[in-house]
């Protein structure tokens, strides 16, 4: 369980260590949200692509992606069914409507995960800001104390 620490009682090296730890946590949470957004965008694009599957497009020619930059010509034969990558190399055949529902559920799940992470990220940012302000105060106190001691010696 996390222990509560009063940052006013910490010295500068301890505050620096705490700031570094908070930097790492903020970076991790920011990266996590960015990765979730990338995956969510892929699901949104996949869901949007299903709109091409209409009866009047059956038999039309199209370009089938082999990689992100290489395509081959193809024909759209079945507009009712699609294969969906469900992870780890497994594909499931679904109707276009079921596929839309699948992608909507995935998008909603990722949105909820990002909403769970966002408050933690904001809290870490606020904690980091408080630590930086305390560090600034401690440095100012040390500077003032050093100047006062130098004046007293003179």
UniProtKB/Swiss-Prot annotation:
The modification N6-acetyllysine is found at residue 42. One of its GO terms (cellular component) is cytoplasm. Keywords: Acetylation, Chaperone, Nucleus. The modification N-acetylalanine is found at residue 2. Its main location: nucleus. GO terms for biological process: negative regulation of amyloid fibril formation; negative regulation of canonical Wnt signaling pathway; negative regulation of DNA-templated transcription; protein folding; retina development in camera-type eye; RNA polymerase I assembly; RNA polymerase II core complex assembly; RNA polymerase III assembly. It is found in: Nucleus. It holds the Pfam family Prefoldin. One of its GO terms (molecular function) is amyloid-beta binding. Belongs to the prefoldin subunit alpha family. This is Prefoldin subunit 5. It comes from Bos taurus. The gene is PFDN5.
